[in-house]
């Protein structure tokens, strides 16, 4: 969520709510997101949100386009209502050249209406204007997602020690899809944003330029997948990411998570990348402690706000 909500008079606007975007609309939204990211230093819409711009309509996902008279796109919001328990989640952005004209508040109000006034909304990077907009909309802080980083140069981690009977290999597209989706769902049953990924979501990621199965590590015991560490390389930023790390719940507690983390970090170091990053919920004290022991420190924080329940 990125918007300067200090209201100044502007041109008439309209907001259109769509289940599916045309290719031209998708291109316009992506251009808007790129311009906003260039100004703000981070994306206002997550990777999943950007992937959901493309292709046929997705169940539970709607797009809100804010245009001025003449059709100029200056604001975008996405609402996803696929979580069976929590309110719908949203992200929004206003073009940097059109902030301070109430467009963010207009999009926020439209999101509240579309969600039946049950809403969660992200403020990536904790942008001050986004925090103010959340307050104006009557939302309360609900979640803190930390981005942690550590240098990879001079990486000094002990040799990974795998639990007895466990071996590690890399992901084979097509062959391992179903098994990975099942373990991912089990490992993140408490985290629907990750645990609800479908074959289509996986295919979307496999089609991205950054996808590299050589950095997607699978841990097996007796031929069964029990854990994984999927790494990602952000080539332009020369940044490696602990993209997703999951352990099947019935096999947790044996040190596999730490071993897989080490294997992935060593792989990223081998790519010549200077820095590694990952995301972790601030209230996941155990995971935060593990990553801090591995040398990670907080780089920035994404904030989620929601309506009072």
UniProtKB/Swiss-Prot annotation:
Residues 16-158, 166-309 form the N-acetyltransferase domain. The keyword Transferase applies. 1D-myo-inositol 2-(L-cysteinylamino)-2-deoxy-alpha-D-glucopyranoside binds at residues 47, 193, 232, 241, 279. The gene is mshD. Catalyzes the transfer of acetyl from acetyl-CoA to desacetylmycothiol (Cys-GlcN-Ins) to form mycothiol. Belongs to the acetyltransferase family. MshD subfamily. InterPro entries: Acyl_CoA_acyltransferase, Bact_Acetyltransf, GNAT_dom, Mycothiol_AcTrfase. It comes from the Bacteria. This is Mycothiol acetyltransferase. It holds the Pfam family Acetyltransf_7. NCBIfam families: mycothiol_MshD. HAMAP family: MshD. Acetyl-CoA 1 binds at residues 92-94. It catalyses: 1D-myo-inositol 2-(L-cysteinylamino)-2-deoxy-alpha-D-glucopyranoside + acetyl-CoA = mycothiol + CoA + H(+). Acetyl-CoA 2 binds at residues 245-247, 252-258. Induction: Gradually induced by thiol-oxidant diamide, under (probably indirect) control of SigR.
């Amino acid at each position: 969520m990125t918007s300067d909500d200090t209201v100044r008079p502007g041109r008439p606007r309209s907001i259109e709510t769509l289940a599916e975007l045309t290719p031209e609309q998708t291109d316009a939204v992506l251009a808007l997101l790129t311009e906003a990211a260039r100004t703000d230093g981070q994306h206002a819409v997550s990777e999943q949100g950007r992937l959901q711009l493309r292709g046929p309509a997705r169940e539970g996902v709607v797009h809100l386009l804010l245009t001025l008279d003449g059709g100029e796109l200056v604001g975008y919001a996405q609402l996803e209502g696929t979580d069976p328990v929590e309110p719908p989640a949203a992200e929004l952005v206003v073009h940097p050249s059109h902030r301070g004209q109430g467009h963010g508040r207009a999009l926020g109000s439209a999101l509240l209406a579309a969600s039946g006034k049950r809403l969660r909304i992200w403020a990536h990077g904790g942008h001050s204007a986004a925090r103010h907009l959340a307050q104006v909309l009557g939302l309360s802080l609900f979640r803190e997602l930390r981005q942690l980083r550590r240098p990879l140069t001079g990486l000094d981690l002990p040799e990974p020690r795998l639990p007895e009977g466990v071996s590690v290999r890399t992901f084979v597209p097509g062959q391992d899809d179903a098994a990975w989706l099942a373990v991912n769902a089990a490992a993140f049953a408490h985290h629907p944003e990750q645990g609800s990924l479908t074959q289509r979501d996986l295919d979307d990621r496999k089609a991205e330029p950054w996808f590299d199965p050589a950095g997607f590590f699978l841990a097996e015991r007796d031929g069964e997948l029990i854990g994984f560490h999927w790494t990602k390389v952000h080539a332009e930023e020369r940044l490696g990411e602990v993209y997703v790390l999951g352990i099947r719940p019935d096999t947790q507690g044996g040190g596999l998570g730490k071993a897989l983390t080490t294997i992935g970090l060593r792989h990223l170091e081998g790519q010549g990348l200077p820095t590694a990053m990952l995301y972790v919920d601030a209230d996941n004290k155990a995971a935060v402690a593990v990553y801090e022991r591995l040398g990670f420190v907080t780089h920035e924080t994404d904030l989620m706000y929601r309506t009072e329940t």
